[in-house]
Amino acid sequence: MNDQWYKHLIGARTIKTGIAIFLTAVFCMALDLTPIYAILTAVVTIEPTAKASLIKGYRRLPATVIGAGFAVLFTYLFGDQSPFTYALSATFTILFCTKLKLQVGTNVAVLTSLAMIPGIHDAYIFNFLSRTLTAIIGLVTSGLINFMVFPPKYYGQVEEKLSKTDALMYKLFYNRCQELILSRLQSDKSEKAYKNIFNLNNQVETLISYQRDELSYHKKKECDWKLLNQLTKRAYTNRLFITHLSNIIYLPKNTRVNFSGDEKMALLKISSSIKDIFYDGSFKREDDSVETLRSTIKALEISGENQIKSHILYEVLMIYRLLDSRYA
């Protein structure tokens, strides 16, 4: 059995959050400090990567200090029983965090500011310093836990999403070619499927960026970088495929395109060969069909007629070329 089964059951990030909360509470209690403010800071500081934790933590600390400062200031002016204290503390904290470009720390700063108001009483300086210290404890603890415990590995998620993207792309390309053969240039169904694929590929690229950040902060073997580069190249090819696919989905309204019998057969064979990649694991070349479409494009360029048709066939050939290179 996998010795890391618990990570699949709970989630590494959840485990790290729990550890960070526990250690933060231990440190604060050992120093006789109220742990709640440090825990709030620790919870929001756990990020997908160690780099993100360090960068955002660097901005959250001054934001928290700002929030604590305004809480003390307005409690001194209006007392802890006034609605103005809460409203002005939150408003000015948000305003200053925005002006100083500390937006990533706004949430924890506002929470800290509002939570500490009832306990300030007359100990203004002490509460300000203690809240600042607890914020530092929360930031440092969660940052170290995120860096040292269960360094994120997104390879599995990336490969899974890439495979899903491939399958959806190939299927949509096949279905879209069927629509074009039947002269259905506008298709809400294809547009919806395209948006789903586009969003899925964005998720892939986000995970790849997370993994690249993680590798840059940890000493990793050359094979890790090699695998990441392979996944990056695959995602880049998918991005190009999706771009060309969009160009045969989003076509001008009120246009008509008619294909000859040979052109329809060529589109059918090319789209079928691409759809079957997911099932066969290989790419069947359709050289004769490709040549048919190339000849049509050349003829249209000479005559200068039906540019939409030429555009569609060109995009189909570009998609074919991408996969021809991938499976060369």
Curated annotation (Swiss-Prot):
Transmembrane segments annotated in the record for this chain: 19-39, 61-81, 108-128, 132-152
UniProt cross-references to InterPro entries, sorted A to Z: ArAE_1
GO annotations of cellular component type: plasma membrane
Membrane topology: Multi-pass membrane protein
Keyword Transmembrane helix: yes
Keyword set, alphabetical order: Cell membrane, Membrane, Transmembrane, Transmembrane helix
Localisation: Cell membrane
Protein family membership: Belongs to the UPF0421 family.
Note: Disruption of this gene leads to an increase in hla (alpha-hemolysin) transcription and proteases production.
PANTHER family noted in UniProt: ALUMINUM-ACTIVATED MALATE TRANSPORTER 10 (PTHR31086)
Name this polypeptide is given: UPF0421 protein SAOUHSC_02103
Native species: Staphylococcus aureus (strain NCTC 8325 / PS 47)
